Amino acid sequence: MEGGGGSGNKTTGGLAGFFGAGGAGYSHADLAGVPLTGMNPLSPYLNVDPRYLVQDTDEFILPTGANKTRGRFELAFFTIGGCCMTGAAFGAMNGLRLGLKETQNMAWSKPRNVQILNMVTRQGALWANTLGSLALLYSAFGVIIEKTRGAEDDLNTVAAGTMTGMLYKCTGGLRGAARGGLAGLTLTGLYALYNNWEHMKGSVLQQSL
């Protein structure tokens, strides 16, 4: 047995000497600093102290300078575009209804189709322009109020809605501006109430307990 082991060692040593690998052995610590040509080094995140992985607060991956929530300026584009599309769709349906009502005594022919199509396009453009203008004014007032106050809350929503209604109806005099402001205040107030309904219910339940 010992002779076999010795002959095996001699054979291994001979092969090692043949391939140029003979000599003193190297440990893993000695080879740790040897650069690997043509290979990527090991990731530095493989050996990390677990204490550095504990986070006390929530963190989000955000672009530099970005807020955790969208501001008024970011939402303005979506608001204006959505209102224009909604107005166009509603106006088209209203125009179709009016066109069919006004031409109900006419037979189905090309003049009737043209008249209905004109009514659809006219009403669609009218409502899209109206809602788009309101959304533009509302977004502009919201951005201005947010930058002025330095805060984003429901007060900005209500104030922007009130000012939008007043400015949109200011051509009707003080009474028209007052009516427009009241309409904007009512709509935005209901919207703010809807957004905070769950929070208000939770507060009431906590007070009752």
UniProtKB/Swiss-Prot annotation:
Coiled coil segments of this chain: none
Transmembrane regions: 73-93, 125-145, 172-194
A single GO molecular function term of this UniProt record: protein transmembrane transporter activity
Localization, UniProt: Mitochondrion inner membrane
Protein origin, superkingdom: Eukaryota
Biological process terms in GO annotation: protein import into mitochondrial matrix; type 2 mitophagy
Membrane-topology descriptor: Multi-pass membrane protein
Presence of keyword Transmembrane helix: yes
Keywords linked to the UniProt accession: Membrane, Mitochondrion, Mitochondrion inner membrane, Protein transport, Translocation, Transmembrane, Transmembrane helix, Transport
GO (cellular component) term, any one: TIM23 mitochondrial import inner membrane translocase complex
Keyword Kinase tagged: no
Subunit and partners: Component of the TIM23 complex at least composed of TIMM23, TIMM17 (TIMM17A or TIMM17B) and TIMM50; within this complex, directly interacts with TIMM50. The complex interacts with the TIMM44 component of the PAM complex and with DNAJC15. Upon mitochondrial depolarization, interacts with PINK1; the interaction is required for PINK1 accumulation at the outer mitochondrial membrane, kinase activation by autophosphorylation and PRKN recruitement to mitochondria.
Family: Belongs to the Tim17/Tim22/Tim23 family.
Function recorded in the entry: Essential component of the TIM23 complex, a complex that mediates the translocation of transit peptide-containing proteins across the mitochondrial inner membrane. Has a role in the activation of stress-induced mitophagy by protecting PINK1 from OMA1-mediated degradation and facilitating its accumulation at the outer mitochondrial membrane in response to depolarization.
NCBIfam families per record: 3a0801s02tim23
Name the UniProt record assigns to this protein: Mitochondrial import inner membrane translocase subunit Tim23
